[in-house]
Amino acid sequence: MFELSSILIRGGGGVLIVLILLLWIVDENCTDAKAMAYNINCTV
């Protein structure tokens, strides 16, 4: 996860898109978005 984040930070422009995708994935697969934000495992 951290390695991926570093690559995204170096990429710069893709960060916003990735964040939006992550939020969408959390909304689809996780009943509690806050749980995902706090790095608690959600059933996928």
Curated annotation (Swiss-Prot):
Topology versus the membrane: Single-pass membrane protein
Factors inducing expression: Expressed in the early phase of the viral replicative cycle.
Residue intervals passing through the bilayer: 6-26
Major location (coarse): membrane
Keyword Transmembrane helix tagged: yes
Cellular compartments annotated: Membrane
Keywords for the protein's UniProt record, in alphabetical order: Early protein, Membrane, Transmembrane, Transmembrane helix
Domain of life according to the entry: Viruses
Gene Ontology cellular-component terms listed: membrane
Name of the protein this chain belongs to: Uncharacterized membrane protein pNG3
Annotated source species: African swine fever virus (strain Badajoz 1971 Vero-adapted) (Ba71V)
